[in-house]
From Swiss-Prot:
Transmembrane segments: none annotated. It comes from Californiconus californicus (California cone). GO terms for cellular component: extracellular region. This is Conotoxin Cal6.21. The cysteine framework is VI/VII (C-C-CC-C-C). Residues 1-22 form the signal peptide. GO terms for molecular function: toxin activity. The keyword Disulfide bond applies. It is found in: Secreted. The keyword tRNA-binding does not apply. Probable neurotoxin. Expressed by the venom duct. Keywords: Disulfide bond, Knottin, Neurotoxin, Secreted, Signal, Toxin. Disulfide bonds join 29-49, 42-54, 48-58.
Length: 66
């Protein structure tokens, strides 16, 4: 029963396409070393950087060596 609730909440988060402010504040994904381009991941989080913001949905692949 709890697993279903977690999945529903997860789907709501994934479909929201909203920046995660907590992660954006913690990870500066606009830094040059993070390659602020679609498809690049924000630090160790499974989030992508789009225009300097960390998003839940990642349309690209994680860069090699990170």
């Amino acid at each position: 029963m709890q697993l279903t609730h977690v999945l529903v909440v997860g789907l709501l988060v994934l479909t929201s396409f909203q920046p995660i402010n907590a992660v954006t504040n913690r990870v500066d994904c606009s830094a040059p070393e993070d390659k602020s381009e679609p498809g690049y991941w924000c630090g160790l989080e499974p989030l992508c950087c789009y225009s300097g913001k960390c998003f839940v949905i990642c349309f690209g692949s994680k860069p090699a060596g990170t």
